[in-house]
Structures are given as structure tokens and as C-alpha cells.
Amino acid sequence: DACHGSYSSKKWVNEIMGLTLNALGGNAFIWKFKHNIIHHTYTNVDGIDDDIAKSPLMRQCSTQKWMPAHRLQHIYILPIYAISSFAWAVLLDFIKYFKGKVQATVLQKMSVKENIVFWSSKILYLIFYIVFPVYFVGWQSWAIGFSCMQVVLGLTLAIVFQLAHVVEQTDFEVAGIEDKLIDNEWAIHQIKTTADFAAKNKVISWLVGGLNFQIEHHLFP
């Protein structure tokens, strides 16, 4: 909510609370660019929306090249989802940082402050999530606890966002990589490329903070 600018009416409060994403291993600056600007504008547009980025291991829409391994992706995809949050923290953010791009879109220039926040939070992540726990409880206990945390987080994030966009009833639209022109106006595009799920399940709604109402979220983020 803070990274969406909706936690508080005060920008500085949202900025501070948004840093809790850094505490989980992500980076608020890169995520806001990747999610708020790109994903919320070019939802399900192959080559632009990083949430459906093409991969040799996972094919998420018909415009992505089919590979023989994809016939088994329904089997091996769960372990990939399970490590996705850890990959986000230690790999994917760095790829975007050093390439200066999110898919085909040039990443907004980071200020000196944002560069300091990026590196300091990544270092603190390693210290508080790996170094300190291994030192105080031993590597075996750490490995079990850390793995359980990452599996739960990775599966939760993947399931929520895949059910909201990568399902049969959503469209996967095409846009020019350079001009980024989509067929429909923004609101129609959001409705066509997004899906609600478990809308009548109060437990799910509570657990995911209302993100199962994904159409509403995209129209009124």
C-alpha cells in the first residue's frame, strides 16, 4: 500500500513505510518503477510487463516462444515459484540495477540517495537474514527456517499474482516495444488483462489484503 502511495495521505509516510519492502529483500525504488509505472500501465503486454517476462523455463502467453521444456512447466514451476522471492532479493533487482532497464523500458535514474539505500539495504538483508542467524543459531537451523520463510513468501506472491493475470479469462495484448501503443484505452485494458479470484472468500481476502480483487486494485490502486 505504501509503495502504491495509498497507505497514507502524506507522501513522506508512504516513503518511509515503503522501505519495509527493502527490509524483505526488495527495493522500493525499482519496484515502484517496475510495478506502478510499467505493470499498472502495460499489464500483460509481452516484452514490456516484467511480471510476465519470458523465460526458457516458463511460457506465460502465446506470443512467447515455445520450448520443449514448457510441456512440463506445470510440474516444475512450483519449486521455481518457491525460490522466486529469494531470487528477487539477490538476483533480479541487481539485473535491473546494472542493466538500467526493466525489460525494454529504461529505468528511471536513481539519485545518490537511492543508490545508497539500494546497496545498504541489500547488505543489511544479507547481515540480518543470513549472517546473524547463522552465527546465533547455526547454519542448519538457519537453513530450515530461512527455507520455510522463502517458500511460503515465494508461493504466496506467485499464486496471488498469477491468479490475477495469467489465467484463461485474461487477455495478453501486444504493443510496440518502442512506441508502447496498446489497442485499448487504459481502463478497458486493465479490465481485459486482470482477473479477480476467490472474491467471496473472506479468509483469502484477509490473508492477501484484498489483492484477490485485482480488477478493482488496477482501476483504483
What would you call each of these model-derived segments?
Residues 22-26, 72-86, 109-160:
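Alpha-helical bilayer-embedded segments of polytopic membrane proteins, i.e.
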